[in-house]
Amino acid sequence: MDFNLKTIMKSGFMITAIAFAGIGQVFAESWILTPKSDVGFEIKSMGLSVVKAKFNQVQSMMQFDSKAPQNASTHFVMDGDSLSFSKPSLKNMILGEDLFYAAKYKTATFKSTQFKDLGNGKYNILGQLTLRGVTNPVTFATTLKPNASNANVMDIQSSAMINRSDFGMRKGIGGVGEKVNIQLTGQWKAK
């Protein structure tokens, strides 16, 4: 009887260890952006120079397993008031009523609907982008690669080109271009 009790206890410990190993695997699929990451956009001003903007407050998450990228998803919420600009003199105009209208629409959001695996760490991430209360489909050309020095980190480069007028922003305002290049550069860290 003593032998059976020991066997049962060993089996219980093994089952517990296997369960915790499984939980660890689930957490390995949840990712958050590191503080070093940049989420922002570029837009031409007066047809000549490029204005760069960065969201300094971004909430994000990603569920991703490189063995099953078709099941991946990501979601971003970007605070419009947190934007900083390479040309600060344009901030009020870009955040004003004719463009972002940040006083009324505090956040911009992106929610993925599909990850298309193109091979070699390249993906098209399809989803819904909401700016100024207007939602449109957008595809981000994305590269996700394991970080060479940290197995819990993936390097990311991602971009999408949109027409700002598709999101209710007025055309021809103050020499600000129609095309906006949205970019994400940085790292995802396993949560």
Predicted features and spans:
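Bacterial N-terminal signal peptides that target proteins for export
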Residues: 2-13
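N-terminal signal peptide c-region/cleavage motif recognized by signal peptidases
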Residues: 21-23
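Short hotspots in intrinsically disordered terminal tails
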Residues: 1-2, 188
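Low-complexity, acidic/polar, glycine-enriched regions of mature
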Residues: 26-191
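Cleavable N-terminal signal peptides
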Residues: 14-15, 26
